[in-house]
Amino acid sequence: MEEVFRFYSNSRNIFIHKSLSLKPSTIDDPKSGYGLFVEPSKFKNDELKSETIQLLRIPKRCTFNINTLLALLGDEDEFSSKEEFQRTNDKIKIALREIMAHPNFSVFLTETNLLIIYFMIFQTIRSRYEIPENIQYYLENVLMSIEVETAMDSIENLATDYGHYPQIFGLRETLNLFKELFHDVLNLSDIKHLYSAIISRCLEIPERADTKSEEFTVHSTLVPIVDFANHEGTQKNAYFDIDPSNNDVLLLLDTKAVQSELTKPIEVFISYSPTEDLFSMLVTYGFTPDFRGNSQFWTVSFDRCFLRNYDGPDKTTNLRLFYKWMHINPVVPLVKYEHNGKTRWFLNDTTPEFDMLLLPFIPSIDDGKIARWAYDSTCHLMFTKIHCLINPEANEHALMIAENYRSLIKEKESNGDDFINLPPLAWSLRYKDTENDCVRQRHICSEDAVAVLKQEEMQDSTKTKSQFTSFFRKFLEFRRSKIIRPTSDSKVASILYQQELEIIADLAKAIDSSSTIFFSDLNVTLDTEPERLPPLRFLDDYIEISADKQEPSPICEDLSYYTPSRFTDFFQEEVSQYAAFFQDD
């Protein structure tokens, strides 16, 4: 890699400060590779008086994102002849046309994945077609030459125990897509290597639309030399930025970080992300940073089979179906935090999403006499009833419509999706109407349910959390029994298993000793905002329940005997609310 550094150092377009060099990283990890170092003794006095020192200036044209790749490919001067220019571009267009025709292409289309696809195309054609020199050099000497290991390298085994994590599920499906797209031109190891090399080196680089505009867009970008800078949150002494006048990428050193040590080389550290989400960093970069005082995060994803087999606090609520119908992300955000001299994992209950997660654990009404939630196993008739009210001409086909809804709902409840994209008419919330001193029931979305329940003056949040804690403790034991031994001997798998076992042991011990597990009980404010929760998983071609284990479906009964008032006191209001869904085209 020193040769790569020298190559770019000799470029007339790239500015590299004379103090900057490339050496094996000081990070205590045999696979940490190389890092950027500065020799403070080579700084000028006036530089040391500034707030920052410019270590690198990489012109936009020397970086690689979708826009710059298209610009390079569209420049005839990047090719030896007009014929080679046309030949290469025709080949790439044909390859892209075939790729875009794949039925799953758009499902996993992101800017980063498209960037990866371009480099995979370059890898398949580079021995027979001309490609711009900048692309060719970076592909051969950086992407295909670096040693890198991410979750992609062992994704098949990781998916066995962690397929319920959306990130792992998405990674596995992305690999399947790339295998189908490139199976006859790239071997599996090259596909995995290129993916890992690009995903672990991509930076989110802002770009100004034009010199007169104040608007910026962000692109997944590969930036030569800058991408050798390692992450170390607590030792961060540099950051990347852009020159808004021309969108050059800059690496800037915080001068204060070197003023105390001017005699020996110092490694340059940047922050890949302001939030240290350990699971995401492990999947993307293949490592997790050590805890050094700043909050770290982990989002636990519930095994879907565990949710489906757990009866809920009232022994009647199927948590898997509840969360699916209510579009509630079946994950628990955790935060690693130092409190009173001890570093521990806590459940981060300070987010709105956590309030939704607790909905099925809210205590029953009137000392358990009235269940908080009611599931309508014949909700296909509710759908049919509303459908026929919105479309009166459909009444003569009511039985057929009911059967269609029954089949549709059965399929959606059984598949691997984390959500059911239908109106939430399967579950009814019972709540206290304090104005009229009575109990009401209605179909409601999760956000509105949280708002309604917060209006109940006597809502027992302590009991709600207690019931959730009991459920979560059982889940921890379930996970401990599932991951007795890793299904892979890869570095990433080893770190992943060790980290989850640490979390399980820490939280189980806290629960068993009646210690605080909810972060809000600490009455402190997080020093860092956690990342957004991972997206809801979609896997509609996978059936979670085998046919022999499914409960027998109810026979379609006469609609005249179905009374919506069994499940809602606001039927007419709900008919109006969901009318758009039921209107026939």
From Swiss-Prot:
Residues 186-288 are annotated as: SET-like. It catalyses: L-lysyl-[cytochrome c] + S-adenosyl-L-methionine = N(6)-methyl-L-lysyl-[cytochrome c] + S-adenosyl-L-homocysteine + H(+). One of its GO terms (biological process) is methylation. Its EC number is 2.1.1.59. Gene3D superfamilies: set domain protein methyltransferase, domain 1. It is an enzyme of class 2 (transferase). Residues 18-273 form the SET domain. Keywords: Cytoplasm, Methyltransferase, S-adenosyl-L-methionine, Transferase. GO terms for cellular component: cytosol. InterPro entries: Ctm1 (IPR025815), SET_dom (IPR001214), SET_dom_sf (IPR046341). Methyltransferase which mediates trimethylation of 'Lys-78' of cytochrome c (CYC1). Belongs to the class V-like SAM-binding methyltransferase superfamily. This is Cytochrome c lysine N-methyltransferase 1. It comes from Saccharomyces cerevisiae (strain ATCC 204508 / S288c) (Baker's yeast). The gene is CTM1.
